[in-house]
Amino acid sequence: MKAPYAWLLAGCLATGGAHASCGAAFCSSSNDWLTLTQDVAAGWRAWMQAEYIKQDQLRRGTEKLSPGQVASHHEEVKTLNRNALFGLEFGFMPEWSASLVLPVSNREHLHIHHHHGTPIPETWQYDQIGDARVTLRYQPATRATGNTSWSVQGGLKLPTGRTDVRNADGDEAERSVQPGTGTTDLLLGGGIARRLDALPGTLFANLTLQAPLDENGGYRPGGRAGLQAGWLLPVQGRLDLILQGNVLHLMRDRGIHAEPEDSGRTEVALVPGLAYAWSRQVSVYGQLELPVYQRVNGIQLAHDYALSLGLSFVLD
């Protein structure tokens, strides 16, 4: 892929954080699609991303469990996440841009409540807006003219998602599977991308942090830290191969309506994918997240893979 297209796509892949908007249930940690490797462009840029994550594997620590191994009053069975993320970025100064990300979640959750030895399945299914994210990004234009580009960003996750979704029986879902957390969270991040003379393509890395600033109704979600690093490798023409690795650490939830014993996790994943620059304005991409290490606190549901597909375009 020619350099201008490679820089465009590397920027789309370098700053993780889309996971910050889908409530406390698991969402993809791979992408945030904010441009890193080019100057802040004046005007508007939009992107949309679809995610599929099926959590149906019980884990205790790093060990996989079968349902028969769990002796609990409350047995988790499945959480199916189909998320759509919509992002909009506006470059209002040569080195500054502002962005808004709004998630929409289609989520199905099933657990079994054991009442005096009788298993009672309880299910929830909803389509809801999650917690929005607003950020400011600073990228020195002078640094993007050479082989290295970097940026920093900060912002807030806002409590726009509901925290009181109920099922057909009138039972309220656990706070961890609600579309929103009810809290305002601080978001910080920074990334770097570099083209090396000795290697084709672009290397990139990004660190993101998220910390709740308050609690809501006796619930405070755990903080998050994510590290993404990878290599955007030209394949042919405008097609690039994405070789990426992610590390995600989630702290325990707190509060009287939280489940601190069964929340918090550490995950390492390989994330291969493809990116195609349709034009200088439009890019499409797809990635497959494959966990290679998962450690959970207590007993939790985990996933075997996650899939994301997206589209990014500049609005002239």
Go through the PLM ranges and name each one.
Residues 36, 48-50, 86-90, 100, ...:
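Residues on the lipid-exposed face of transmembrane beta-strands in outer-membrane beta-barrel proteins
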Residues 106-221, 316:
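Outer-membrane pore/translocation modules
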Residues 59-68, 215-316:
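Outer membrane beta-barrel transmembrane domains
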